[in-house]
């Protein structure tokens, strides 16, 4: 079993930005002492939904402050920055950490990011393809060039080269079928969303495996990751109550982040995400409290035994044994770390990989 901790850097109303960033560093370091393998960092811009505009910089800090902890991005919005500049960042982190950096990528969801950084969001799929190809070639061969419709530059040497053979491991944050298929074609592990239930997780993995096998990949040893909102307490109601205020503000902040500009919903190529929101509305989840209640049904929020049952059910359905938990809904920094420690002592040891028998 592997266990990760994803760090939101959401700014709740009671904290200023200095406190959020300080807490990020402290929780990253606590991840190592609490037995987590990886701390995952999320990229966000122009909103309190996440204060981390550059996860590469934050990853460098946490890698330097820890000895064994892996640090990953979940995820870098790949199309919004130059691929060679990002390649240099990834290789440098890979070198300086001696292979402890994990490179999680996505094509992006927020119109605001593309608009401000001058990238055509409707072209995000093609840019994702091109940027990924350029970067992986540079990791493997040590030099890059490009002469396609998206970017042109002559052959250059990449420095530093990668520390890890064939480059830092790549993960893909995947929600839609098209992104799942894209990752499967390349045999890349995916990070599954915390907002989908057991059956949806299994269906996503079934789709992935079908496509990956068609492209000649061995699906038996791909390091997929399931993500969760997590709160552990011996009193189930207390675990749920302490999260509710945080999650209410966080969910509302997410909605605001998707619509900073009035015409954000006009972008082409994001039909899955629009459909997902329509389904949420039809299920009554537009109401914040109902959305939170549903989250509690599919995420490990409750007693240690309740958390074990929810996660183990997903492990048995999918075969995934890399579990990534987010604890920031648990209140103060002290309360967050207390929940992490209880997860370490009363949940981690009792989760088992799916038996192949």
From Swiss-Prot:
Descriptive protein name: Alkanal monooxygenase alpha chain
Function, in words: Light-emitting reaction in luminous bacteria.
Subunit details: Heterodimer of an alpha and a beta chain.
EC number: 1.14.14.3
Species, as recorded: Kryptophanaron alfredi symbiont
UniProt record similarity statement: Belongs to the bacterial luciferase oxidoreductase family.
EC primary class: oxidoreductase
SUPFAM superfamilies for this protein: Bacterial luciferase-like
Molecular-function GO term, any one: alkanal monooxygenase (FMN-linked) activity
């Amino acid at each position: 079993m592997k266990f990760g901790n994803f760090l939101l850097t959401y700014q709740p109303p009671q904290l200023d930005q200095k406190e959020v960033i300080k807490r990020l560093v402290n929780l990253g370091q606590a991840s190592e002492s609490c037995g987590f393998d990886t701390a995952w960092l999320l990229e966000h811009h122009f909103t309190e939904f996440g204060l981390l505009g550059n996860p590469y910089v934050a990853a460098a800090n946490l890698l330097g402050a820890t000895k064994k902890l892996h640090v990953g991005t979940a995820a870098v919005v790949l199309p919004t920055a130059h691929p060679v500049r990002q390649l240099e960042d990834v290789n440098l982190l890979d070198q300086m950490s001696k292979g402890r950096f994990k490179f999680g990528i996505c094509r992006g969801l927020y119109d605001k990011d593309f608009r401000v950084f001058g990238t055509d969001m409707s072209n995000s799929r093609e840019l994702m393809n091109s940027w990924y190809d350029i970067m992986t070639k540079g990791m493997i061969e040590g030099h890059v060039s490009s002469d396609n419709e998206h970017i042109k530059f002559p052959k250059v040497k990449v420095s530093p080269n990668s520390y890890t053979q064939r480059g830092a491991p790549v993960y893909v944050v995947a929600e839609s079928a098209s992104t799942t298929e894209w990752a499967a074609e390349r045999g890349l592990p995916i990070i599954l969303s915390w907002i989908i239930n057991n059956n949806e997780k299994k269906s996503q993995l079934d789709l992935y495996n079908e496509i990956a096998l068609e492209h000649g990949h061995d699906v038996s040893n791909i390091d997929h990751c399931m993500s969760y909102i997590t709160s552990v307490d011996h009193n189930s109601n207390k675990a749920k109550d302490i999260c509710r205020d945080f999650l209410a503000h966080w969910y509302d902040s997410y909605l605001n982040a998707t619509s900073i500009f009035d015409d954000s919903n006009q972008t082409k190529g994001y039909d899955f995400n629009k459909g997902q929101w329509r389904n949420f509305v039809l299920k009554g989840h537009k109401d914040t409290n109902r959305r939170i209640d549903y989250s509690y049904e599919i995420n490990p929020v409750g007693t240690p035994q309740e958390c074990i049952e929810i996660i183990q059910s997903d492990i048995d359905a999918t075969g995934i044994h890399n579990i990534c938990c987010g604890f920031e809904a648990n209140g103060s920094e002290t309360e967050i770390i207390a929940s992490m420690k209880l997860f370490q002592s009363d949940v981690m040891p009792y989760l088992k990989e799916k038996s192949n028998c």
